[in-house]
Swiss-Prot record:
Chain segments carrying region IgA-binding: 199-438, 439-826
Propeptide, chain numbering: 1136-1164
Cellular location(s): Secreted, Cell wall
Sites bearing Pentaglycyl murein peptidoglycan amidated threonine, chain numbering: T1135
Chain positions covered by the region annotation Disordered: 54-75, 167-220, 536-567, 823-947
Comp. bias intervals (Pro residues): 911-920
Membrane topology summary: Peptidoglycan-anchor
SMART domains: IG (SM00409)
Organism: Streptococcus agalactiae
PROSITE patterns: GRAM_POS_ANCHORING
Name of this chain's protein: IgA FC receptor
InterPro entries: GAG_BD, GAG_BD_sf, Ig-like_dom_sf, Ig-like_fold, Ig_sub, LPXTG_anchor, RICH, RICH_sf
Residue positions of motif LPXTG sorting signal: 1132-1136
Sequence ranges of Polar residues compositional bias: 59-73
Length: 1164
């Protein structure tokens, strides 16, 4: 029968108690008090029997009390009748008078009865047959009551464990049957518990709304979300899946509420102020200020009625917290300065009044300390830099006033007996100064440009010591909050070890820095060291931390690497994913056109420009570190930082891209006031309000509030405007359509008209007014650019035509206004520049030296006029009557052909024809007149100053005496112009032959950037100064296949001017005078059978350039049709070349002179 431990203990106690009573009875018998003892025994026996007779539940029954299978666990209780106990006790009481043999027999009988009962209990249990036989055998072998009791306890314990095991198996089978039944039942999920939970959540939401824990917007949104969760649960296949899904969704339910924002603010405070979150000791004043700021923000959060207001409160708190964090070093620095000023003032007063016995410095010290402590509390509460500066000035002013009043009161003549020095906290005690030890390691630091510098500062003292970094902060004032970082390795009152890091040193930041340490007694020790920044000799590659200066290498803390390699690899993979996002964001940003700096964009642009270099350095360093697993920076800490930095840089790139897009929208719809209003109120950054120092969650919140939200609003406005435009213009214009061609033609027309207007003004402008053309150019350029912008946005060809005519009208009006201003300021008529006077033709003018003979022209070399034109082969005339000086004349100038002389400037009046001499004497020939400076062609006219500052690019180049100037209408991606003359005579002769004769010179024009040739599209104006140039010049483009294309050109101020949209080989043909009078038929552009194949000598221009110029094939010329040159006027240019009339007169005079010489020789 199964019994509990409690029942066993009761039986054992009863038996022992009976024996004890018997012992008392024996003692009483011998002491004469038997009756009394019997009564005691009887009463106690009855009470004990009654207690023992009371049934108690077994342990198994207690454990399984309410279980349905408790009946299975009930065991037979050991019931000891009262009569049996009396029988067991009474014999013991009488043992004193009975013999030992009888007593022993009774005990054996009782023991045997106990064995039989125990065997019956064993038979009635669920033990196995083997276990039952084992227990029975042990019972039979046991003859001692204690051993039998121990065996009984062992049997009960075994039986109990067996029942427990049986019960567990039953429960396991029961659950298996339930699972099987559930799977076989209908798949419909029982949502009773889920509905109950969701209804509870709805009541919680209603309660939070009543207590203003959430806004009405959040309330409606959350209730709707709960219903959505209910619907999702109803569609689940399994109850477990539904419950998991409900828990997940309910966890997200409160993320956007005021409660979530409240938690975010409190977590930020905990992160900044908790000693567990910070390796450095948190400043107490900073912690208190941050907690006060958080408390105010939480109060404002409770008052918020909309989500926008609540989010704004949270973002404002993060901004203020960041500013508070940034100002803490300045507060400390200001407090240090204040204590330093007090100490210096007191020392100075003490020196001045040390012989004044009446001066009580203790009062002054007390007042000074009171002021310093008062303002120390105020400074710690400062929220911004202006407030901090104001309090600092007030404190110094008050401190100075107190000291001055004390000085005036006690300053007297020196006393004979000096007063004993007052001992005070901040006095300068010379004996104690040596007790402060201040060291800097390394003392002299050398780093390269762009690297970080690290050094360690150690201070030891017998009393409390503070470090003063004010000189360091002044000389390396950080532009961002984390440029200078301080990491205290040891930070006790009398021992401090600080590791200082200064990031990204510039070349001009070599400094000598002084650090100070001061103890409570006012002792100050200074330590000076130098930081030298050198320029990198090799290619500038952003260095990884392993490449830093060797002196600081050993000072870098060896951070333990992560033991969990799988976790570290997951972190690296996550950082690489953020890097890919960053590179993608930068690539998308580069596809957006850059915006020139302007008041609306200046601050934003400066922020982005400042981020470019750190971004590139971070990317390069990260890629290098992940490729070297042996690096000590291959740790979880550094990869977490890279990941965080990449996420911050993504936000910077997105803010820049959104800004550029909005500027494009504003240019597209410049009259839309709503777009401009949103941009200026939200996205426009100022010096006081920008995100330059924000990072992580603060930067993300700033981006969402001030960039993403307003951009989405602007984008919606633009989309609506675009739809409206599409409705007004039903048929979209395809790319490269006639409309696009019309726009391009219109732009070219406006540009050409502007150039034509400028050329006309420049020709008639007086030389002294050349500088004024700059203002005119700027006005015309502005009209052109605005017109081009309007043309791009035009929708119809009629609109384009109107824009072009409007531009012409505006340019004409601008030029008229400009000319009117010139007439008012300049009375002279600025028709033409002043021309040097043509020397009066002598009786027998002598032809200039080295005339250019048409029969054998040399194209490559330009004719030069010597300084003193002397004819080397002119014989001296033996007799020269009536001529004091015998001029040198040519031997016999050829009369059939007029000599080719350089052109002279156009004269206002026709030269006077001298009358034929009446005498046969040789006429007096004057000295050979110096030709005017005009034959030496002037340099290419310089463009007005500032021409390239308003959207144009100007390049110049020279080759010998040839100079070229090229003007682009817009900035060009090139930095140098190259001019080279192709001197292959056969090439020039072939081109001359195919174009109808004349002098031909071939030039190669090209552009380069960074020393490499580049090809730039776009129209450009070429001005080529060749030396002496005739008035009739043809320009040809030599194509890749050898064809010649005639390009419209003109001669202006001695320069050949033409326009083209590319560079290659150009042939310049100058027609001789005979050709100018009687133009050949070949000058008319025509297309005949075969083409001229000209192989170019230069390499890299075309594929055929490697061929020899002698590969010019015979055949007819193919000349593209073009406008005839505009330089066929009779008006002489300013080149010094005389007209045909002058040549004829000079030839006639030469003929007359020759006749006189011939007649003189006959006479002799």
């Amino acid at each position: 029968m199964f019994k509990s431990n409690y029942e066993r203990k009761m039986r054992y106690s009863i038996r022992k108690f009976s024996v004890g009573v018997a012992s008392v009875a024996v003692a009483s018998l011998f002491m004469g008090s038997v009756a009394h003892a019997s009564e005691l025994v009887k009463d106690d026996s009855v009470k004990t029997t009654e207690v023992a007779a009371k049934p108690y539940p077994s342990m198994a029954q207690t454990d399984q009390g309410n279980n349905s299978s408790s009946s299975e666990l009930e065991t037979t209780k050991m019931e000891i009748p009262t009569t049996d106990i009396k029988k067991a006790v009474e014999p013991v009481e009488k043992t004193a008078g009975e013999t030992s043999a009888t007593d022993t027999g009774k005990r054996e009988k009782q023991l045997q009865q106990w064995k039989n009962n125990l065997k019956n209990d064993v038979d009635n249990t669920i033990l196995s047959h083997e276990q039952k036989n084992e227990f029975k055998t042990k019972i039979d072998e046991t003859n001692d009551s204690d051993a039998l009791l121990e065996l009984e306890n062992q049997f009960n314990e075994t039986n109990r464990l067996l029942h427990i095991k049986q019960h567990e198996e039953v429960e396991k089978d029961k659950k298996a049957k339930q699972q099987k039944t559930l799977k076989q039942s209908d798949t419909k999920v029982d949502l009773s518990n889920i509905d109950k939970e969701l209804n509870h959540q709805k009541s919680q939401v209603e309660k939070m709304a009543e207590q203003k824990g959430i806004t009405n917007e959040d309330k409606d949104s959350m209730l709707k979300k709960i219903e959505d969760i209910r619907k999702q649960a109803q569609q689940a296949d399994k109850k477990e899946d539904a419950e998991v899904k409900v828990r997940e969704e309910l966890g997200k339910l409160f993320s956007s509420t005021k409660a979530g924002l409240d938690q975010e603010i409190q977590e930020h405070v905990k992160k900044e102020t908790s000693s567990e979150e910070n390796t450095q000791k948190v400043d107490e004043h900073y912690a208190n200020s941050l907690q006060n700021l958080a408390q105010k923000s939480l109060e404002e959060l409770d008052k918020a009625t909309t989500n926008e207001q609540a989010t704004q409160v949270k973002n404002q708190f993060l901004e203020n917290a960041q500013k508070l964090k940034e100002i803490q070093p300045l507060i400390k620095e200001t407090n240090v300065k204040l204590y330093k000023a007090m100490s210096e003032s007191l020392e100075q007063v003490e020196k001045e009044l040390k012989h004044n016995s009446e001066a009580n410095l203790e009062d002054l010290v007390a007042k000074s300390k009171e002021i310093v402590r008062e303002y120390e509390g105020k400074l710690n509460q400062s929220k911004n830099l202006p407030e901090l500066k104001q309090l600092e000035e007030e404190a110094h002013s008050k401190l100075k006033q107190v000291v001055e009043d004390f000085r005036k009161k006690f300053k007297t003549s020196e006393q004979v007996t000096p007063k004993k020095r007052v001992k005070r906290d901040l006095a300068a005690n010379e004996n104690n100064q040596q007790k402060i030890e201040l060291t800097v390691s390394p003392e002299n630091i050398t780093v390269y440009e762009g690297e970080d510098v690290k050094f360690t500062v150690t201070a030891k003292s017998d009393s409390k010591t503070t470090l003063d970094f004010s000189d360091l902060l002044t000389k390396y004032n950080p532009s961002v909050s984390d440029r200078i970082s301080t990491n205290y390795k040891t930070n006790t009152d009398n021992h401090k070890i600080a590791e200082i890091t200064i990031k990204n040193l510039k070349l001009n930041e070599s400094q000598t820095v002084t650090l100070k340490a001061k103890d409570d007694s006012g002792n100050v020790v200074e330590k000076t060291f130098t930081i030298t920044v050198q320029k990198k000799e090799e290619k500038q590659v952003p260095k990884t931390p392993e490449q830093k200066d060797s002196k600081t290498e050993e000072k870098v803390p060896q951070e333990p690497k992560s033991n969990d390699k799988n976790q570290l690899q997951e972190l690296i993979k996550s950082a690489q994913q953020e890097l890919e996002k960053l590179e993608k964001a930068i690539k998308e940003l580069m596809e957006q056109p850059e915006i020139p700096s302007n008041p609306e964009y200046g601050i934003q642009k400066s922020i982005w420009e400042s981020q470019k270099e750190p971004i590139q350095e971070a990317i390069t360093s990260f890629k290098k570190i992940i490729g070297d697993s042996s690096s000590k920076y291959y740790t979880e800490h550094y990869f977490n930082k890279y990941k965080s930095d990449f996420m911050n840089y993504q936000l910077h790139a997105q803010m820049e891209m959104l800004t550029r897009k909005v500027v494009q929208y504003m240019n597209k719809y410049p009259d839309n006031a709503e777009i401009k209003k949103i941009f200026e109120s939200d996205m426009k950054r100022t010096k006081e309000d920008n995100y330059g120092s924000l990072e992580n969650d603060a930067l993300k919140g700033y981006f969402e509030k001030y960039f993403l939200t307003p951009f989405n609003k602007i984008k919606q406005i633009v989309d609506d405007l675009d739809k409206k435009v599409e409705q007004d213009q039903p048929a979209p214009i395809p790319e490269n359509s006639e409309m696009d061609q019309a726009k391009e033609k219109a732009k070219i027309a406006v540009s050409k008209y502007m150039s034509k207007v400028l050329d006309g003004v420049h020709q008639h402008l007086q030389k002294k007014n050349n500088s004024k053309i700059v203002d005119l150019f700027k006005e015309l350029e502005a009209i052109k650019q605005q017109t081009i912008f309007d043309i791009d946005n035009a929708k119809t060809e009629v609109e384009i035509d109107n824009l072009v005519h409007d531009a012409f009208s505006k340019m004409n009006a601008t030029v008229a206004k400009f000319q009117k201003g010139l007439e008012t300021n300049t009375p002279e008529t600025p028709d033409t520049p002043k021309i040097p006077e043509l020397p009066q033709a002598p009786d027998t003018p002598q032809a200039p030296d080295t005339p250019h003979v048409p029969e054998s022209p040399k194209a490559p070399e330009a004719p030069r006029v010597p300084e003193s034109p002397k004819t080397p082969e002119a014989p001296h005339v033996p007799e020269s009557p009536k001529a004091p000086e015998a001029p040198r004349v040519p031997e016999s100038p050829k009369t059939p052909e007029a000599p080719h002389v350089p052109e002279s400037p156009k004269t206002p009046e026709a030269p006077k024809i001298p009358e034929p001499p009446k005498t046969p004497d040789v006429p007096k020939l004057p000295d050979v007149p110096k030709l005017p400076d005009v034959p030496k062609l002037p340099d290419a006219p310089k463009l007005p100053d500032g021409l390239n500052k308003v959207g144009q690019a100007v390049f110049t180049s020279t080759d010998g005496n040839t100079k070229v100037t090229v003007v682009f209408d817009k900035p060009t991606d090139a930095d140098k112009l190259h001019l080279k003359e192709v001197t292959t005579k056969e090439l020039a002769d072939k081109i001359a032959h195919k174009t109808g004769g004349g002098t031909v010179r071939v030039f190669d024009l090209s552009l380069s950037k960074g020393g490499k040739e580049t090809h730039v599209n776009g129209e450009r104006t070429v001005r080529l100064a060749l030396g002496q140039t005739g008035s009739d010049v043809h320009v040809y483009h030599v194509k890749e296949n050898g064809d010649l294309e005639r390009i419209p050109s003109k001669v202006e101020n001695g320069q050949v001017v033409f326009k083209t949209n590319h560079f290659s080989l150009f042939a310049i043909k100058t027609l001789s005078k005979d050709q100018n009078v009687t133009p050949p038929k070949q000058t008319k552009p025509s297309t005949q059978g075969s083409q001229v194949e000209i192989a170019e000598s230069q390499t890299g221009k075309f594929q055929s350039k490697a061929a020899n110029h002698k590969a010019l094939a015979t055949g007819n010329e193919t000349v593209a049709k073009g406008n005839p040159t505009s330089t066929t006027e009779k008006k002489l240019p300013y080149t010094g070349v005389a007209s045909n009339l002058v040549l004829e007169i000079m030839g006639l005079l030469g003929l007359i002179g020759t006749s006189f010489i011939a007649m003189k020789r006959r006479k002799s």
